Curated annotation (Swiss-Prot):
It comes from the Eukaryota. Its cofactor is pyridoxal 5'-phosphate. This is Putative cystathionine beta-lyase. It catalyses: L,L-cystathionine + H2O = L-homocysteine + pyruvate + NH4(+); an S-substituted L-cysteine + H2O = a thiol + pyruvate + NH4(+). The modification N6-(pyridoxal phosphate)lysine is found at residue 208. InterPro entries: Cys/Met-Metab_PyrdxlP-dep_enz (IPR000277), Cys_b_lyase_bac (IPR006233), Cys_met_metab_PP (IPR054542), PyrdxlP-dep_Trfase (IPR015424), PyrdxlP-dep_Trfase_major (IPR015421), PyrdxlP-dep_Trfase_small (IPR015422). It comes from Saccharomyces cerevisiae (strain ATCC 204508 / S288c). Pfam families: Cys_Met_Meta_PP (PF01053). Keywords: Amino-acid biosynthesis, Lyase, Methionine biosynthesis, Pyridoxal phosphate. GO terms for biological process: L-cysteine catabolic process to pyruvate; methionine biosynthetic process; sulfur compound metabolic process; transsulfuration. One of its GO terms (molecular function) is cysteine-S-conjugate beta-lyase activity. Pathway: Amino-acid biosynthesis; L-methionine biosynthesis via de novo pathway; L-homocysteine from L-cystathionine: step 1/1. Its EC number is 4.4.1.13.
Length: 340
Protein backbone atom coordinates (compact mmCIF):
# COMPACT_ATOMS: atom_id res chain seq x y z
CA UNK A 1 0.00 0.00 0.00
CA UNK A 2 1.32 3.46 -0.91
CA UNK A 3 2.31 5.63 2.05
CA UNK A 4 -0.16 8.52 1.78
CA UNK A 5 2.40 11.01 3.05
CA UNK A 6 4.43 10.29 -0.10
CA UNK A 7 1.49 10.13 -2.51
CA UNK A 8 2.27 13.45 -4.18
CA UNK A 9 5.53 11.95 -5.49
CA UNK A 10 3.51 9.76 -7.83
CA UNK A 11 1.85 10.72 -11.12
CA UNK A 12 -1.69 12.05 -11.26
CA UNK A 13 -3.04 8.73 -12.55
CA UNK A 14 -1.79 6.94 -9.44
CA UNK A 15 -2.95 9.71 -7.12
CA UNK A 16 -6.49 9.66 -8.52
CA UNK A 17 -6.59 5.89 -8.03
CA UNK A 18 -5.66 6.13 -4.35
CA UNK A 19 -7.16 9.30 -2.83
CA UNK A 20 -10.51 8.92 -1.10
CA UNK A 21 -9.97 5.21 -0.46
CA UNK A 22 -9.14 3.60 2.90
CA UNK A 23 -9.30 -0.21 2.56
CA UNK A 24 -7.77 -0.72 6.02
CA UNK A 25 -10.81 0.99 7.55
CA UNK A 26 -13.32 -0.82 5.32
CA UNK A 27 -12.63 -4.52 5.89
CA UNK A 28 -10.32 -4.50 2.88
CA UNK A 29 -12.88 -3.26 0.37
CA UNK A 30 -11.30 -0.87 -2.15
CA UNK A 31 -14.16 1.60 -2.40
CA UNK A 32 -15.72 3.29 0.63
CA UNK A 33 -19.30 2.32 1.49
CA UNK A 34 -22.23 4.67 1.09
CA UNK A 35 -23.24 6.21 4.42
CA UNK A 36 -26.81 7.57 4.56
CA UNK A 37 -28.55 8.83 7.65
CA UNK A 38 -29.53 11.63 9.97
CA UNK A 39 -29.31 10.27 13.53
CA UNK A 40 -25.96 9.28 15.02
CA UNK A 41 -25.77 7.34 18.30
CA UNK A 42 -23.57 8.98 20.93
CA UNK A 43 -22.10 7.15 23.92
CA UNK A 44 -21.89 10.02 26.41
CA UNK A 45 -24.25 12.77 27.46
CA UNK A 46 -21.33 15.22 27.42
CA UNK A 47 -20.71 14.44 23.74
CA UNK A 48 -24.33 15.28 22.95
CA UNK A 49 -24.23 18.49 24.99
CA UNK A 50 -20.95 19.70 23.50
CA UNK A 51 -21.69 18.57 19.93
CA UNK A 52 -18.39 16.72 19.98
CA UNK A 53 -17.25 14.84 16.90
CA UNK A 54 -19.86 13.68 14.43
CA UNK A 55 -23.07 14.37 16.32
CA UNK A 56 -25.72 14.57 13.55
CA UNK A 57 -26.10 13.92 9.84
CA UNK A 58 -25.53 17.59 8.99
CA UNK A 59 -22.02 17.26 10.45
CA UNK A 60 -21.10 15.02 7.53
CA UNK A 61 -20.37 11.34 7.08
CA UNK A 62 -17.45 9.08 6.16
CA UNK A 63 -18.66 9.27 2.54
CA UNK A 64 -18.40 13.06 2.60
CA UNK A 65 -15.06 12.91 4.44
CA UNK A 66 -13.56 10.69 1.75
CA UNK A 67 -14.48 13.12 -1.03
CA UNK A 68 -13.40 16.20 0.96
CA UNK A 69 -10.03 14.63 1.81
CA UNK A 70 -9.48 13.53 -1.78
CA UNK A 71 -10.27 17.00 -3.14
CA UNK A 72 -8.03 18.66 -0.55
CA UNK A 73 -5.16 16.47 -1.73
CA UNK A 74 -5.90 17.26 -5.37
CA UNK A 75 -6.08 21.04 -4.84
CA UNK A 76 -3.25 21.35 -2.34
CA UNK A 77 -5.50 23.33 0.00
CA UNK A 78 -5.78 23.15 3.78
CA UNK A 79 -9.32 21.79 3.67
CA UNK A 80 -12.44 21.31 1.54
CA UNK A 81 -16.16 21.67 2.14
CA UNK A 82 -18.85 20.32 -0.15
CA UNK A 83 -22.25 21.69 -1.06
CA UNK A 84 -25.25 20.63 -3.11
CA UNK A 85 -24.18 22.67 -6.19
CA UNK A 86 -21.42 24.83 -7.60
CA UNK A 87 -23.44 27.94 -6.79
CA UNK A 88 -23.76 26.68 -3.22
CA UNK A 89 -19.96 26.58 -2.93
CA UNK A 90 -19.66 30.08 -4.42
CA UNK A 91 -22.21 31.29 -1.86
CA UNK A 92 -20.28 29.69 1.01
CA UNK A 93 -17.02 31.29 -0.12
CA UNK A 94 -18.51 34.78 -0.50
CA UNK A 95 -20.38 34.57 2.81
CA UNK A 96 -17.21 33.38 4.56
CA UNK A 97 -15.19 36.39 3.39
CA UNK A 98 -17.72 39.25 3.42
CA UNK A 99 -20.03 41.02 5.86
CA UNK A 100 -22.30 44.06 5.94
CA UNK A 101 -20.41 47.16 4.84
CA UNK A 102 -17.84 45.26 2.77
CA UNK A 103 -17.06 45.75 -0.92
CA UNK A 104 -16.48 42.99 -3.49
CA UNK A 105 -14.77 43.32 -6.88
CA UNK A 106 -16.40 40.81 -9.23
CA UNK A 107 -15.32 39.98 -12.79
CA UNK A 108 -17.91 41.24 -15.28
CA UNK A 109 -17.74 37.92 -17.16
CA UNK A 110 -18.93 35.95 -14.14
CA UNK A 111 -21.44 33.09 -14.21
CA UNK A 112 -24.88 34.76 -14.27
CA UNK A 113 -26.23 33.10 -11.07
CA UNK A 114 -23.17 34.44 -9.20
CA UNK A 115 -24.06 37.95 -10.40
CA UNK A 116 -27.64 37.40 -9.23
CA UNK A 117 -26.33 36.31 -5.82
CA UNK A 118 -24.29 39.51 -5.47
CA UNK A 119 -26.98 41.87 -6.78
CA UNK A 120 -29.70 40.17 -4.75
CA UNK A 121 -28.90 38.36 -1.51
CA UNK A 122 -25.52 39.95 -0.74
CA UNK A 123 -26.82 43.43 -1.55
CA UNK A 124 -29.70 42.82 0.86
CA UNK A 125 -27.14 41.91 3.52
CA UNK A 126 -25.31 45.21 2.96
CA UNK A 127 -22.45 43.96 0.77
CA UNK A 128 -21.57 46.20 -2.19
CA UNK A 129 -20.41 44.68 -5.51
CA UNK A 130 -18.63 46.42 -8.39
CA UNK A 131 -17.89 44.61 -11.66
CA UNK A 132 -14.50 44.90 -13.35
CA UNK A 133 -13.26 44.23 -16.88
CA UNK A 134 -11.86 40.66 -16.81
CA UNK A 135 -8.83 41.87 -18.81
CA UNK A 136 -7.96 44.61 -16.31
CA UNK A 137 -4.91 42.90 -14.78
CA UNK A 138 -2.87 44.98 -12.33
CA UNK A 139 -4.99 48.07 -13.06
CA UNK A 140 -7.63 46.60 -10.78
CA UNK A 141 -5.75 48.47 -8.04
CA UNK A 142 -7.53 51.64 -9.22
CA UNK A 143 -10.87 50.08 -8.21
CA UNK A 144 -9.84 49.01 -4.71
CA UNK A 145 -11.70 50.76 -1.89
CA UNK A 146 -10.83 50.89 1.82
CA UNK A 147 -13.59 48.34 2.49
CA UNK A 148 -12.76 45.95 -0.39
CA UNK A 149 -12.46 42.46 1.10
CA UNK A 150 -12.76 40.12 -1.91
CA UNK A 151 -11.65 39.98 -5.53
CA UNK A 152 -13.63 37.28 -7.33
CA UNK A 153 -12.15 35.73 -10.47
CA UNK A 154 -13.57 33.37 -13.07
CA UNK A 155 -11.10 32.27 -15.71
CA UNK A 156 -11.98 31.87 -18.48
CA UNK A 157 -15.11 34.01 -18.23
CA UNK A 158 -18.59 32.64 -18.84
CA UNK A 159 -19.52 33.00 -22.50
CA UNK A 160 -16.89 35.58 -23.40
CA UNK A 161 -14.01 33.24 -22.44
CA UNK A 162 -11.39 35.82 -21.40
CA UNK A 163 -8.47 34.24 -19.54
CA UNK A 164 -7.52 36.46 -16.62
CA UNK A 165 -4.04 37.50 -15.52
CA UNK A 166 -4.44 35.71 -12.22
CA UNK A 167 -0.94 36.39 -10.81
CA UNK A 168 -1.39 40.14 -11.41
CA UNK A 169 -4.78 40.19 -9.69
CA UNK A 170 -3.50 38.11 -6.77
CA UNK A 171 -0.50 40.42 -6.37
CA UNK A 172 -2.76 43.48 -6.01
CA UNK A 173 -5.03 41.60 -3.62
CA UNK A 174 -2.18 40.58 -1.33
CA UNK A 175 -0.75 44.11 -1.36
CA UNK A 176 -4.04 45.43 0.05
CA UNK A 177 -4.93 42.51 2.34
CA UNK A 178 -7.80 41.43 0.07
CA UNK A 179 -8.86 37.79 -0.26
CA UNK A 180 -9.29 36.09 -3.65
CA UNK A 181 -11.88 33.56 -4.77
CA UNK A 182 -11.60 31.74 -8.11
CA UNK A 183 -14.29 29.78 -9.91
CA UNK A 184 -12.03 27.05 -11.33
CA UNK A 185 -14.76 24.86 -12.84
CA UNK A 186 -13.50 25.16 -16.44
CA UNK A 187 -9.95 24.02 -15.74
CA UNK A 188 -10.31 21.83 -12.62
CA UNK A 189 -7.21 21.38 -10.41
CA UNK A 190 -5.71 19.16 -13.12
CA UNK A 191 -5.35 22.02 -15.61
CA UNK A 192 -4.90 24.95 -13.19
CA UNK A 193 -3.41 24.88 -9.68
CA UNK A 194 -5.33 27.69 -7.99
CA UNK A 195 -3.69 27.64 -4.56
CA UNK A 196 -0.18 27.44 -6.03
CA UNK A 197 -1.04 30.66 -7.88
CA UNK A 198 -1.99 32.38 -4.62
CA UNK A 199 -5.79 31.99 -4.68
CA UNK A 200 -7.30 31.89 -1.18
CA UNK A 201 -10.49 29.92 -1.93
CA UNK A 202 -11.00 27.85 -5.09
CA UNK A 203 -14.56 26.82 -5.94
CA UNK A 204 -15.79 24.34 -8.49
CA UNK A 205 -19.02 22.87 -9.78
CA UNK A 206 -18.19 19.17 -9.60
CA UNK A 207 -21.48 18.70 -11.43
CA UNK A 208 -19.49 19.26 -14.61
CA UNK A 209 -16.20 17.40 -15.08
CA UNK A 210 -15.80 15.66 -11.73
CA UNK A 211 -19.16 13.94 -12.13
CA UNK A 212 -18.91 13.82 -15.89
CA UNK A 213 -22.14 11.92 -16.57
CA UNK A 214 -24.93 14.48 -16.03
CA UNK A 215 -26.30 12.56 -13.06
CA UNK A 216 -25.23 14.51 -9.97
CA UNK A 217 -25.18 18.00 -8.44
CA UNK A 218 -22.23 18.91 -6.24
CA UNK A 219 -19.99 21.86 -5.42
CA UNK A 220 -16.55 21.94 -3.83
CA UNK A 221 -14.64 24.76 -2.14
CA UNK A 222 -11.04 24.41 -0.97
CA UNK A 223 -9.22 27.03 1.09
CA UNK A 224 -5.67 27.83 2.11
CA UNK A 225 -4.53 27.76 5.75
CA UNK A 226 -5.59 31.35 6.48
CA UNK A 227 -9.11 31.12 5.04
CA UNK A 228 -9.90 27.53 5.97
CA UNK A 229 -11.31 28.28 9.47
CA UNK A 230 -13.62 30.96 8.00
CA UNK A 231 -14.85 28.66 5.25
CA UNK A 232 -15.37 25.72 7.60
CA UNK A 233 -17.26 27.72 10.22
CA UNK A 234 -19.56 29.18 7.54
CA UNK A 235 -20.23 25.69 6.24
CA UNK A 236 -20.98 24.39 9.75
CA UNK A 237 -23.45 27.23 10.32
CA UNK A 238 -25.36 26.58 7.10
CA UNK A 239 -25.20 22.76 6.72
CA UNK A 240 -25.30 22.94 2.91
CA UNK A 241 -23.98 19.42 2.43
CA UNK A 242 -24.74 17.35 -0.70
CA UNK A 243 -26.47 13.98 -0.82
CA UNK A 244 -24.48 10.85 -0.06
CA UNK A 245 -25.16 9.30 -3.48
CA UNK A 246 -23.81 12.38 -5.25
CA UNK A 247 -20.63 12.20 -3.17
CA UNK A 248 -20.15 8.55 -4.04
CA UNK A 249 -20.68 9.24 -7.75
CA UNK A 250 -18.21 12.13 -7.57
CA UNK A 251 -15.61 9.85 -6.00
CA UNK A 252 -16.15 7.38 -8.82
CA UNK A 253 -15.84 10.15 -11.40
CA UNK A 254 -12.56 11.25 -9.86
CA UNK A 255 -10.88 7.99 -10.90
CA UNK A 256 -11.23 8.81 -14.60
CA UNK A 257 -11.13 12.61 -14.47
CA UNK A 258 -7.70 12.86 -16.12
CA UNK A 259 -8.69 10.54 -18.96
CA UNK A 260 -11.98 12.29 -19.68
CA UNK A 261 -10.47 15.78 -19.55
CA UNK A 262 -7.84 14.91 -22.14
CA UNK A 263 -10.44 13.42 -24.47
CA UNK A 264 -12.75 16.39 -23.96
CA UNK A 265 -9.84 18.70 -24.74
CA UNK A 266 -9.04 16.87 -27.97
CA UNK A 267 -12.62 16.76 -29.21
CA UNK A 268 -13.29 20.40 -28.30
CA UNK A 269 -10.20 21.60 -30.17
CA UNK A 270 -11.25 19.62 -33.25
CA UNK A 271 -14.78 21.04 -33.12
CA UNK A 272 -13.56 24.58 -32.50
CA UNK A 273 -11.19 24.38 -35.48
CA UNK A 274 -14.00 23.09 -37.71
CA UNK A 275 -16.34 25.86 -36.59
CA UNK A 276 -13.62 28.43 -37.24
CA UNK A 277 -13.70 27.47 -40.93
CA UNK A 278 -17.46 27.84 -41.27
CA UNK A 279 -18.73 30.80 -43.29
CA UNK A 280 -21.36 31.56 -40.65
CA UNK A 281 -18.81 32.00 -37.84
CA UNK A 282 -17.14 35.36 -37.22
CA UNK A 283 -14.92 34.19 -34.38
CA UNK A 284 -14.23 31.23 -32.12
CA UNK A 285 -13.56 32.09 -28.47
CA UNK A 286 -11.37 29.28 -27.15
CA UNK A 287 -8.52 29.96 -24.68
CA UNK A 288 -6.16 27.68 -26.63
CA UNK A 289 -6.61 29.81 -29.78
CA UNK A 290 -4.16 32.69 -30.23
CA UNK A 291 -6.85 35.32 -30.87
CA UNK A 292 -8.80 34.53 -27.69
CA UNK A 293 -8.49 37.35 -25.10
CA UNK A 294 -5.89 36.35 -22.52
CA UNK A 295 -4.50 33.46 -24.59
CA UNK A 296 -0.98 34.37 -23.42
CA UNK A 297 -2.05 33.82 -19.80
CA UNK A 298 -3.51 30.45 -20.69
CA UNK A 299 -0.17 29.46 -22.26
CA UNK A 300 1.73 30.69 -19.20
CA UNK A 301 -0.47 29.37 -16.39
CA UNK A 302 -2.58 26.43 -17.60
CA UNK A 303 -1.74 22.80 -18.29
CA UNK A 304 -4.59 22.17 -20.72
CA UNK A 305 -7.94 23.31 -22.06
CA UNK A 306 -11.34 21.80 -21.37
CA UNK A 307 -14.45 21.50 -23.48
CA UNK A 308 -16.35 24.76 -23.04
CA UNK A 309 -15.89 27.50 -25.65
CA UNK A 310 -18.01 30.05 -27.54
CA UNK A 311 -18.58 31.19 -31.11
CA UNK A 312 -19.59 34.59 -32.48
CA UNK A 313 -21.88 34.42 -35.52
CA UNK A 314 -21.59 36.87 -38.39
CA UNK A 315 -24.09 39.68 -38.80
CA UNK A 316 -27.26 38.72 -40.61
CA UNK A 317 -28.11 35.70 -38.50
CA UNK A 318 -31.74 36.07 -37.41
CA UNK A 319 -33.39 34.72 -34.27
CA UNK A 320 -35.50 32.45 -36.48
CA UNK A 321 -32.39 31.12 -38.18
CA UNK A 322 -30.70 30.48 -34.86
CA UNK A 323 -33.75 28.63 -33.53
CA UNK A 324 -33.87 26.48 -36.65
CA UNK A 325 -30.21 25.57 -36.23
CA UNK A 326 -30.14 24.70 -32.52
CA UNK A 327 -33.55 23.04 -32.42
CA UNK A 328 -32.67 20.95 -35.47
CA UNK A 329 -29.50 19.43 -34.02
CA UNK A 330 -29.66 15.67 -33.51
CA UNK A 331 -26.60 14.91 -31.35
CA UNK A 332 -25.83 18.20 -29.58
CA UNK A 333 -28.80 19.26 -27.48
CA UNK A 334 -29.94 22.41 -25.65
CA UNK A 335 -29.14 22.46 -21.95
CA UNK A 336 -27.75 24.60 -19.13
CA UNK A 337 -24.84 22.36 -18.12
CA UNK A 338 -21.74 20.86 -19.69
CA UNK A 339 -19.17 18.18 -18.98
CA UNK A 340 -21.56 15.23 -18.85
Amino acid sequence: MIDRTELSKFGITTQLSVIGRNPDEQSGFVNPPLYKGSTIILKKLSDLEQRKGRFYGTAGSPTIDNLENAWTHLTGGAGTVLSASGLGSISLALLALSKAGDHILMTDSVYVPTRMLCDGLLAKFGVETDYYDPSIGKDIEKLVKPNTTVIFLESPGSGTMEVQDIPALVSVAKKHGIKTILDNTWATPLFFDAHAHGIDISVEAGTKYLGGHSDLLIGLASANEECWPLLRSTYDAMAMLPGAEDCQLALRGMRTLHLRLKEVERKALDLAAWLGNRDEVEKVLHPAFEDCPGHEYWVRDYKGSSGLFSIVLKNGFTRAGLEKMVEGMKVLQLGFSWGG
